[in-house]
Amino acid sequence: MSSRNIKGKEIALAKQKGINPFEIKVALDGLAVVVNPANSVSKLTLDQLADIFTGKITNWKDMGGKDEKIVILSREVNSGTHVYFKEHVLRKGDANGKEEFAPGALLLSSSQAIADEVAGNSAAIGYYGMGYICNKQKAIAVAKDNKSEYVNPNIDNVLSGKYPISRPLF
């Protein structure tokens, strides 16, 4: 299973070997953005998320939370989850976008590592597939923009297309 589309160079390599690859969507996944339950912030727009994860916003007080430096957590760069979040949240779907994660972002090896860090750090924010959500983290509601409805990451909202950080799995 993969959380990203087949890359052009992968298709070309397969064809060189006589294989004609194709994708089959087998599931949908929502990427939950999570904070520690002690964090009072419960909703953010995609623009606010982009500003946090790129380092433009560095303190929770700017988002209505405590005066505390934001600790950014991300999956490692070779993770499909990392790539999807960068392309669809930081770069807002712009294929020519240059936005990157903040230099101080902590790159962790697994979604479970992000879940554990968020559970123990009141200033942390991270993201992972909805299946990792538990009561030791708080999933925040996300809106496409400040004029849109804030939507919680849950199965119904992913299936209906309401949740803005959803992706197919292949």
Model-derived features: positions:
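Exported/periplasmic ABC-transporter solute-binding proteins
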Residues: 1-170
